[in-house]
Amino acid sequence: PFLRLNQSRLNREMLSGATEEQYGIIGRHRLAEMEDMDAYIEIRGGGNAFELSSVPQENMAAAMKALNPVSQRRIRHTRWCGLRWPSGGMAQQASMSTEEFEDFYFRTCLMDYAALRPAMRKLAAMMEKAEYVKITGPGTDISFSIKGLPAIPCAGECNLPDGEVFTAPVIDSANGHISFNTPSLFQGIPFDNIRLTLKNGLVVHAEAGDKTGELNTILDTDPGARRLGEFAFGVNPAITRPMRNILFDEKISGSFHLTPGQAYHVADNGNQSRIHWDMVCIQTKAAGGGDIYLDGKLVRRNGLFTLPELAILNPSLS
C-alpha cells in the first residue's frame, strides 16, 4: 500500500504560495502515482473546515486545473471509497456533541444499505424512463430534461455514508429558478441561501447574500461551471438535517441536489468543468416543502415519496 498524509494547514500554505507552474508539476506527479494504483481509499478529517477560506480564488483555480485530471483518473479507473473521520470539528459544524456525532456517524455509515437497494433501483428505473423533471417549492420553479441519461443508485459501494440516486440534466435543457435552503461549504467558504436562475442550461444569475461575489467567481472558473452536471435525490433515511458537510448533506432524505460543474462519466451529459459543486435543497414540510414531478407525475411531495414501493427511502421517524 501507498500512504499519503495531508494536513489542511499545510495545504493552505501550499495553495497560498505555489505558482501555477509549480501546481502543474505537482499535478503531473500525482497523476502518475494515481495511474499506478488499483484502488484508492480516502479518509478525511480535520479541526477547521474553514482553513482554506482565505486562499485567493485564482490560486484555488490553478490548483483545481492541475489536480482535476487526478480526480478524474481516480473516479474512472480505480476502485475507490471516500469517507470522513468523525472528528470534533465535524461535530461542531453539525452543532452536535462529539459523542452524539460519533453515534450518528456510525449509524449512517453502517446502516443496512442492502435493504434500501431494491427501492433505489426502482427509483433509478423510473428516472431512466422519464424525459422531463419539474421541481417546485419556495423560491423554486425549474424544469429540465433527463432523457437518455443513465440513473445511478448509490447504496454503499463508494461513498460512506451513502444514499442517493443521480443522473444529469441534458446540458442545455434547464430553465427556471431555484433556491437552495441548505448551507454549503465550498473551497473553505461558507454559503447560505444560494439562488440560481438558469436559461437553456446556463446559470445566468446567481446570488448568495454577502457571498454573491465569491459565488460568481467560482461559477466563472470555466464555461462548464455555469452548467449542471448532476441531478440527484437524497434518500438516506437516517440523515434528516444538514451537517455542513456535503458527503452527508447530499444524502439527506427528502432532499435533492443540483450540481454546477463536471458530470460523472457514468451519467455523462457532456459537461466538463474543474468544479463539481453539489447544492442541496431539503423539501420536507419542516423545511418549507416542495414537489418533484417526472413527466408530469408527482413522485415526491414535501420530501416524501408518493409510491408505496419507495416508502423505505422516506425520512426515518425514529
What are these regions (language model features)?
Residues F2-R4, T136-P138, S145-K147, N181, ...:
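Generic beta-strand/beta-sheet core signal
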Residues G46-N48, S87, T140, L149, ...:
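Short, glycine-/Ser/Thr-/acidic-enriched flexible segments
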Residues Y132-I135, I194, V204, G288-L298:
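Short polybasic amphipathic segments
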Residues P1-N175, I312-P315:
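Active-site bordering "gate/hinge" segments
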Residues M126-E128, I171, Q187-P190, G224, ...:
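Short solvent-exposed loop/turn micro-motifs enriched in small/polar/acidic residues
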Residues I171-T217:
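Long, well-ordered mid-to-C-terminal structural blocks that present hydrophobic/aromatic surfaces
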Residues H205-N269:
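Dual-mode signal for accessory low-complexity, basic/Gly-rich regions
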Residues R244-L317:
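Internal helix-turn-beta structural module
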